[in-house]
Amino acid sequence: MAAAAASGAGGVAVAGAGGAGPAGRLLPPPAAGPPAAPAAVPPAAVPARPTAPASRGSMAARIGYYEIDRTIGKGNFAVVKRATHLVTKAKVAIKIIDKSQLDEENLKKIFREVQIMKMLCHPHIIRLYQVMETERMIYLVTEYASGGEIFDHLVAHGRMAEKEARRKFKQIVTAVYFCHCRNIVHRDLKAENLLLDANLNIKIADFGFSNLFTPGQLLKTWCGSPPYAAPELFEGKEYDGPKVDIWSLGVVLYVLVCGALPFDGSTLQNLRARVLSGKFRIPFFMSTECEHLIRHMLVLDPNKRLSMEQICRHKWMKLGDADPNFDRLIAECQQLKEERQSDPLNDDVLLAMEDMGLDKERTLQSLRSDAYDHYSAIYSLLCDRHKKHKTLRPGALPSMPQAMTFQAPVNLQAEQTGTAMNLSVPQVQLINPENQIIEPDGAVNLDSDEGEEPSPEALVRYLSMRRHTVGVADPRTEVMEDLQKLLPGFPGVNPQGPFLQVAPNMNFTHNLLPMQSLQPTGQLEYKEQSLLQPPTLQLLNGMGPLGRRASDGGANIQLHAQQLLKRPRGPSPLVTMTPAVPAVTPVDEESSDGEPDQEAVQRYLANRSKRHTLAMTSPTAEIPPDLQRQLGQQSFRSRVWPPHLVPDQHRSTYKDSNTLHLPTERFSPVRRFSDGAASIQAFKAHLEKMGNSSSIKQLQQECEQLQKMYGGQVDERTLEKTQQQHMLYQQEQHHQILQQQIQDSICPPQPSPPLQVACENQPALLTHQLQRLRIQPSSPPPNHPSNHLFRQPSNSPPPVSSAMITSHGATSPSQFQGLPSHGAIFQQQPENCSPPPSVALTCLGLQQASQSQPVTIQLQEPVDMLSNMAGTAAGSAGRSIPISPSASQIQIQHRASLMAPFSYGHRPLSKQLSADSAEAHSLNMNRFSPANYDQAHLHPHLFSDQSRGSPSSYSPSTGVGFPPTQALKVPPLDQFPTFPPSAQQQPPHYTTSALQQALLSPTPPDYPRHQQVPHILQGLLSPRHSLTGHSDIRLPPAEFAQLIKRQQQHRQQQQQQQQQQEYHELFRHMNQGDAVSLAPSLGGQNMTEQQALSYQNADSYHRHHTSPQHILQIRAQDCISQGPSPTPTHGYAHQPPLMHSESMEEDCLCEGLKEGFPDKSSSTLTKGCHNSPLLLCTSGPGDPEPLLGTVSQARELGIHPYGHQPTATTFSRNKVPSRESVLGNCLERSSPGQAMELPDHNGLGYPVRPLVSEHLRSRTLQRHHTIQNSDDAYVQLDTLPGMSLVAGKALSSARMSDAVLSQSSLMGSQQFQDEEDEECGVSLGHEHPGLGDGSQHLNSSRYPATCVTDIMLSHKHPEVSFSMEQAGV
C-alpha cells in the first residue's frame, strides 16, 4: 500500500516503498549469527571469465575492491548486496542499479539521489562511499548498518521506554534538521527507513524521494508512505517540504513510544479518512510531556505545527540526562544553514593510505573534487574506523596496479552488451488482462541468485505479513549465517558469478559517473507525477502495486516458495535447522500440537543422549539371515519410518504442509524445549520403542525370552481366571474414577494437609479434565502450598455443566471451572435458599471438614424457581437435602436435573474475559461470598467470643430468610407486609456443618464499624493469597469436627429458645399494633449502634437489623464492603424490585451504565456511579429520603458508608465492582436497580430501558484506546440520553486507565480534574433529595468518573498492590 502510493507510474522500486529513488534502504536487518568471513581471494586469482558456474561459497564474486557476501534487499530495478572491502575489511552495502530498465526521468532521479547523498555527511545518516558506473550498471557503495531497521527492532522487542525513545528521537531530529539546513527534504521518514548500527545508533536511509527545496516555495509531488504522510499530501495540495517531514517525525515518535501507528486503516480510503480527521488515541502509559509534543507535531494545519527549532527546545526533549552530542550536532546544523563546512582532513588516515601504496596527491584530488571513487571510499572507511576504534590497520593493497586502469578484453566488452551477462537485477513484469505474467523482452536473467533461500530478516518481515503492523518475530528464522547458505534438504542451485565479468576489468578512471552529469545546472526541474495516480505495475506477490523495495529483502520469497512446490517433498528447511537456533522460546499452549504424556517425555529425555547412535553403520551385518527374511529382505535403515509415517506423508511441521509455510496469522513458534531435532514428532514413536536398546540383537534376545516364558502350552483355566481378574480390575478402576469425579464435582475437597501434596502431584489430571471440556487454560494452575484458589486436585464439573462454562466465553478455567452463571442460578432464590450442590464453590478454596461429617446442602429445585417466577408458590422456600460425601449414594441423573434449569439462565458474554478480569471476579467472590462465615475455626485467637455467634448457628428457621417475594414483585403479597410465614412454609431443621454455613449463608444485615479484617485474613479474601506468602493457618479436620460436635447441642437449644422468644414477641407486637417497636426488640441492636448510623430508618417496611450472632465478624478495612439485607427478621416486607445482574465480568454492568456509556472500557471509573454505596433505592411509601446519605455525612460520623445500603459496591482493582443485593445467596448479588418486568425466554426478567443499538456495546480494550481530545468524546456522546459533557470528559479520561486502578493511571489525565471535583461536590450534596419513590436508579452522568475515582482511591487497601504487573496487563 505504501509502495503503491509512493512510486507513481514507472517509478523505481528500489528503496523506501518502491518509490522513485533507488537508494532506499541500503542496509539490512542483522543476521542472527556472526557474519561469515568471505573467502580471501586475491584479485589476481580471480579469472576474467569463469569456465563453469561458481558454486555458492566456493568462489566469491567481486566488484573492484569489494567482495560480495549475499543479497540483503531487492527492488524492481535494483538489488542491494552486502560486501566486504578488501583493504579495510569493512562491511558495506552496494546497491546495483540496472540503467537499461530505467527511463530518462527515473535516471535523473537516481542522479539526484546521488547528488543529495554527496551533500550529507552526518553521523546519523547513511554515508555514500563510492559511485561506480558501467554501460549498464550503477554501483552505489554505502554504509552498512548491521542493526537493521528500527521497525524490526520494535517487532522483536516491543515499544520502547520513553527514555530510550528520547535518545533515538534526538538522533533522528539531528539528522533531519541537518537535511533541512542543507535545503534537503526527505519526504519518506518512517520506521522502515530508520536503521540501527552495531551500537544501536540511528542511521537514516532511503533518499530516493528526497529533493532540494527553496524556503518559502511549495512542492507538489505526492510521495512517501501513507501511514506517515501528512494530510496535505492526501488532499493533493501543494505543501511545505519541512512541514511534511515534521508530521512524519510525529508519527515516528508515536510508533517508538507506543509500538503502533496513530493512523492505520485496512484500505487507503480508510487511512486517508483517519489522517484527515487528525484524531488519534493517546495510551495511558504515555507521559504528558510526550503527549504534548506529539499533539503539536500532528496538527492538521501545517502552519501550526512545531518547527525543528521548537522541537529541539521542547520540554520532553530536555528531560533526562544532558546530551552533549545532541547539543553539538544542533549547533553545527545552525552553522551549516548558509555555507557548507568541510571537515578537516585526517593526516593519520592519509599517512596510512600512503603506507598502503596509494598516492596521497591522488587521494587529495579525489576528496576535493567529490569524485567518490575508490580513493575517497578508502579514506572514508578508514576515517570511520579511526573514529570508532581509534586505530588504523593498514594492510597491503591487493595486487592491482596503482593506476587502477584495466584493459578489458574484446570478448568481454562484447559480452557486456550481449545476453551472457549474468548480473541480474529484478525487472518489472507487467500483468496482462488474463492475469498472466508476460516475460520481459530479451533473454536477460532477472536474478543472479534465483536459487538463494530468503534471508532470515526477510522471512521475519514476510511472516509478519504487514510492514506497518508490529507483529511477533519468528525465532525459527534466526539461524547462524554460515548455515544459511545451504539449507539441508534442498539441492543447491549453482548461481553463476554475476560480477566477475565486470569487476577486475573495469577502468575506474574512465567509468566513473561523469561529474558534469551530477552537478545541477541551476535549479533542477523534473516533470512532476500526477497526484495520487495509481501505478500501472503489479508485482508477483499480490501485495499491491510496487509493494516491494530494495530494502524489503523478501523479493525472492515468492520465487523460493514456487521452487519448493516443484521439488520433492520433505522436511521444511525452516524447521530442520534446529541445531542453529540460538534462542529458546516458550511453548504456546494454545497453538501446540498435542502434548505427550509425562512418561513418554521422561523416557525420551532419559535416552536422548543415545539418539545419534541408534542408526547402525552396517545394519545387515548384525541382522541374522532368518530375521532378514522375516523383514522381507530389507535393511534396517529402510524400515526406520513406520508404514504410516513415510517421508512423503509424515507431519514434519506443526502445520500439515509439505511446502514452505507462510502463514497469514501471527503466531508464536511452537517448538518445544525438549526438541533435539525438527523431526521429533515423526521419530517420537520410534525413539520410545528403540530408546532402551541400541541393537537389533537385544530386541531379538528379549523376543526369544518372551517366547520361552509364554510360548508353551497355557492352561485354559489359568487364562480364564486371568481374564476375569483383569475385567474386575478394570471395573474397579472405572468405578473409582467415577466416584472421584462425582465427589470432586459435588463436595469441596477436604482441608487436610495431605491433599495439598496430592494436588501438587496431579497437574496432568487437571490438564486432562480441561482438555476434555475443550477449555484451554490461560495459565497453568499454580501449585503453591498456600494457594487457596487451586487446592482441589481435580475440579472437574459434571458433564452437564460444560455448557454453562463454555457459554461464558473464555473464562479462566482455573478459577471458574464448574461455576455456572451466578445471576442465572440465584436470581430468584429466597435468601434462606442455598446454591445447588453442583456449584461446588471450587474457586473459594474453603474445604470441608472430613469425610465422615455429613453435609447438608440446601438447594432449590426447579419447581421452586418456577413457582417464584409465576408468583404462585409464595411461601415456597429452599428445601434442604442431606447429601453424604460418599459419591456412591448420589445419582448422576438427579444432579443433571438440578443443573439443567441453570444452564440457560443467563445471557452469554459479549466478549471473552481476560485473565485480569477473571482475577477481579474471583476477588469479588472470595471477599464477599462467605458472608456469614465465622472464621473461628481458622483463626480462633483473632475473634472475641462475646461478639461472635457459633459458626453454624444459622439455620433457615432463624427467621432471617427472605420471603419468595424477594425475587419477583408480587402485588398481592405487598398488601401484607407483616404477615408471618406459616409453619408449613418453614423448611425442616437439618444440621449443617460450619463449612456449609460459611459457604451458603446469606449476607448479614449490617456490619458494625468496629469490625476489622486482620492482615492475615486479608489474604483469604484476596485472589492473590498465593502471592502474598501467607501460610495456611486452618484447624486440622479432626479438631474442627470436634468443635462442630461440641457446638451442635448448644446451637439447637439456642435456636429453639430464640425462635420461641421471637414468635412470642412477634404476636405480642402484632396484637398491640406497634410495628415500629419491632426494630430494637427483634433486631437485638442497642440504641448506641443505631445512633451511630446515619442511615437509620425506623419504618417497619425497612428493617435493617438482625441478631448480632448472624453478623460476620470480618470485613475489609479500607474497602466498601457488602451491603445488608434490607428485610425484617419476620414477616413479609415491601421489597424493592430487583434488576437482572449478568453472570460474569463485562455483562454485569447495571443497565443505567449501558445507557450512559458507549464503551465498557470506561467502566473503570464509571461503573460505580449507579451502584454507589451512596445511592439507596429502597425507599418505602412516604419515606423517600431517610435512607439517602452522602460520603460527607458518613465521614463526619467516622464510619464507612456501608452500614445499610442494599447496593453497596466494592471497588476492586479491576473493572468489576462486586454487587451485594437483597438476596442472600453466597456468590453474587444483583443490585435493586429497576423494576422487574415480564420474564424473557430464559425465565429471567430484564428491566425496561431505552433500546440501545449494538454498536454501543463495548469492544475489547486495546493498548491505545484513549481518544485524542475531548471533542471526540462530545461527538460520540451527543446522541446518548442522560450523558452530560462532564461525564463525557470523564469517559475520555477514563480510557487512559486501561483497567488499572492506580494513582498514576487513574489520575493520568488532569485536564478536567478541577471542574470534575467541583461537579462531584455539587452532585453528592444536592442530587439525592431529588429522588422520589419511583426512582429506581440514578443516572450515571450525575456522578462524574473522578468522584468515583476518589472513592476508589480512598478505600483502596494499603497492602493490596494495584500495579500493572500483578494485573497481568
UniProtKB/Swiss-Prot annotation:
List ligand-binding residues for ATP.
I72, G73, K74, G75, N76, F77, A78, V79, V80, K95
- Identify residues that carry Phosphoserine: S551, S591, S592, S674, S695, S914, S1026
Q: Where is the composition biased (Low complexity)?
A: 46-55, 944-957
Q: Which residues carry this modification: Omega-N-methylarginine?
A: R1034
Q: Offer an example of a GO molecular function term for this protein.
A: protein serine/threonine kinase activity
**What region holds the Protein kinase domain?**
66-317
Q: Which reaction does it catalyse?
A: L-seryl-[protein] + ATP = O-phospho-L-seryl-[protein] + ADP + H(+); L-threonyl-[protein] + ATP = O-phospho-L-threonyl-[protein] + ADP + H(+)
**Does the record's keyword annotation contain Cytoplasm?**
yes
Task: Describe PTMs of this protein.
Answer: Phosphorylated at Thr-221 by STK11/LKB1 in complex with STE20-related adapter-alpha (STRADA) pseudo kinase and CAB39.
The record's section on SUPFAM superfamilies has: Protein kinase-like (PK-like)
Task: Please give the residue positions where the record annotates the modification Phosphothreonine.
Answer: T71, T221, T469
Q: Cite the InterPro entries for this sequence.
A: Kinase-like_dom_sf, Prot_kinase_dom, Protein_kinase_ATP_BS, Ser/Thr_kinase_AS, SIK, UBA
Stretches of the chain forming a coiled coil according to its record: none
Active-site feature positions? D188 (proton acceptor)
Which residues does the UniProt record annotate as the domain UBA? Answer: 344-384
Q: How is its activity regulated?
A: Activated by phosphorylation on Thr-221.
Question: What enzyme class is recorded for this protein?
Answer: transferase
Question: Which family does the UniProt entry place this protein in?
Answer: Belongs to the protein kinase superfamily. CAMK Ser/Thr protein kinase family. SNF1 subfamily.
Q: How does it assemble?
A: Binds to and is activated by YWHAZ when phosphorylated on Thr-221. Interacts with 14-3-3 proteins. Interacts with HDAC4; this interaction leads to HDAC4 retention in the cytoplasm. Interacts with DEPTOR, MLST8/GbetaL, RICTOR and RPTOR.
Q: What is this protein called?
A: Serine/threonine-protein kinase SIK3
Annotated organism of origin: Mus musculus
